[in-house]
From Swiss-Prot:
Organism, as annotated: Borrelia duttonii (strain Ly)
Pfam families recorded: Ribosomal_L5 (PF00281), Ribosomal_L5_C (PF00673)
SUPFAM superfamilies per record: RL5-like
NCBIfam families in UniProt: PRK00010.1
GO-annotated cellular components: ribonucleoprotein complex; ribosome
Keyword set, alphabetical order: Ribonucleoprotein, Ribosomal protein, RNA-binding, rRNA-binding, tRNA-binding
A biological process from GO: translation
GO molecular function, one term: tRNA binding
Coiled coil location: none
Protein name per its UniProtKB record: Large ribosomal subunit protein uL5
Annotated InterPro entries: Ribosomal_uL5, Ribosomal_uL5_bac-type, Ribosomal_uL5_C, Ribosomal_uL5_CS, Ribosomal_uL5_dom_sf, Ribosomal_uL5_N
Entry's family note: Belongs to the universal ribosomal protein uL5 family.
Amino acid sequence: MSYIPELKRRYRDNIVKELVSEFQYKSIMQAPKIEKIVVSMGVGDAVKNKKLLDSAVMELSQITGQKAVKTKAKKAISGFKIRQGQEIGAKVTLRGNMMYEFLYKLVNLALPRVKDFRGINGNAFDGNGNCSFGIAEQIIFSEIDYDKIERISGLNVTIVTTALNDKEGKALLAKFGMPFSN
């Protein structure tokens, strides 16, 4: 018997049944689920200081437990002195057990450490049940050692679901314990 994360077990045993009864699905296969979580960090100053980009990759890897990849600029923006193909950020795509472990850590350990946190804005959804929000400081995660970071920077979290609309997506994430302000 292999290890099953707590949130995955809770989803399988409780959340699916609650969603089926709440939205009157004909089958449990219609219930929305989380497909992936993308955690990204833009490093605008990477143009001048390559060390910042390496530190962002290291921090994302520590936070998520999975190796981060560097992202490149899609097109040149002269105002920001960015050339096409230049490395300007880092991202991690989490699926499976790692995704559930990160979500548990985010909801129960990291978000409660945010100063004056009142919940994630209910308008953080894109119309298709996917939720995107920003975190101002990476130091809310316990894996980051405050003394060893180059600088305090924020990160973006996108939770991609199979929900058909925002109402279903918000209900799914709320059942996982995600705090919403409205």
